[in-house]
Amino acid sequence: MNSVMRNLGLSALAVAVLTSCAATSTETATPATTPQAYQVPLAQPPQVSQPLTLNQIMANPDWMGIFAKEAYWSDDSQSVFFARQASASPLRNYYQQGINDSRAVELAIDKLHAADQQFGVLDSAKANKAYLYQGNIFVKHLSSGKITQLTRQRTAISGLRYLNNGDIAYWQGDNVFQIHQDSGLVEQLAEIKMAKAPEGVKEPSSYLAKQQHRLIQYVALQQENAKAKEQFKNELQKSDPTLAANTWYLGDAEVVSELSLSPDGRYLFVALTDKNYTGSSEHDIMPNYLGSEGYIDPVPVRARVAEDNPPGQRFVVLDLNEHKQIDVTIEGLTGFDEDVLAKVKSENAKAKGESYQSTKAPRKIQLMQDWGWTQSAIQWHESENKLAVMVEATDNKDRWIASVDLAKGKFITEHRLHDDAWVNYDYNQFGWLPGTDSLYYLSEETGYSQLYIKARGEKPRALTQGKFVVSDITLSPDANYIYYKANQSHPGMYNVHR
């Protein structure tokens, strides 16, 4: 090994010397042809009898073969869809593999929209599936396979759901819409503007203004006309059923982080974040030495943990029927004001010869940030206006599952997970058991991710126990069974359980 490293060092030195000499030469050689882009050769796969080398391990993994990725079942469970990425290609190809076929069929690019989609939503009768493709809405009738495109626009739609009456609701930016299935009418349920509400026509307040209105008839007339127009506009909004709902003004200090609509379309749960928070600063950069222009590019990255100061989030419920805003308080979260770092701060103070006095203060709370899940931290009951959310403290010591009192704007703790070190950013799946008042969830309160169910107001019940990890929760279509993955037999072996 020392001999190899010495030879590499001498080779590098020789190259450096030759390069230096070339740089100081008075004659500049002009290439006869334009140099072609250099294609990095892939490492050759080793023979079975040969051990892996460091060069092989660190090489582009294409030498191992072209793997199937992101596989999922078709809607009729008779085939599997998956993607493959050709060697050294930045693009993916998509395939369909029938369970009784010997070969997979590559999907044509103009047929991708018609392929069964992994992340769709079903109506209450499980007869239709709505999904997003390239930011537009499609609906598939599952029994016939017929697909209908409902939108074709450049502004992408970010989410959708079926309402209890069979209509489709979707949100686009900070706007929420409903597509009426009987008529095709698109109704705007909510328009959220992050700005201060207009003040409307104001009465003169200063002495000078009042005299101006009293003495000059034209000024007084303009004031009365403005008030009349405003009154007519308000009366029209209340009386005319063909108009969209009034705009919501939530202030100019925040931005919408996430929103979610209730099953009947009445309530909108919104998470708001300080608009000035970016998660990084001008000092949080990483140099890219392979910039396309030949220079070192400063690439923005997230702030270091010790320097980041996330502001938390504010939560509101918008009652779309009553046009009423309800601010959600966090006092219902057990330990929301605990000084969870008191022990560490006390030790640090003692080392300095000082004393530390612990005090209670509200902690910063935000929706749970999970690195692995595809679900949302906001979970509505399948058919009722019952809401559960998963939130975390920005100090990373606590995670809560809380139900939400929509009328009063209060969190009610259903489960609290505390970790003196760091709450895991994985194993956080949760949701409602259909047709019940119970939640299912994963928790590492025993040190291992285990599965629990809990009825509101009652104690949780563990469905799994032991020194193994449970993950990937899936409910059966009839909700009578829960499927999960666990490494119960061996830490490196995962099996599916029911």
Regions found by a protein language model. Name each.
Residues 1-9:
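Bacterial N-terminal signal peptides that target proteins for export
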Residues 10-11, 17-498:
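Beta-propeller folds
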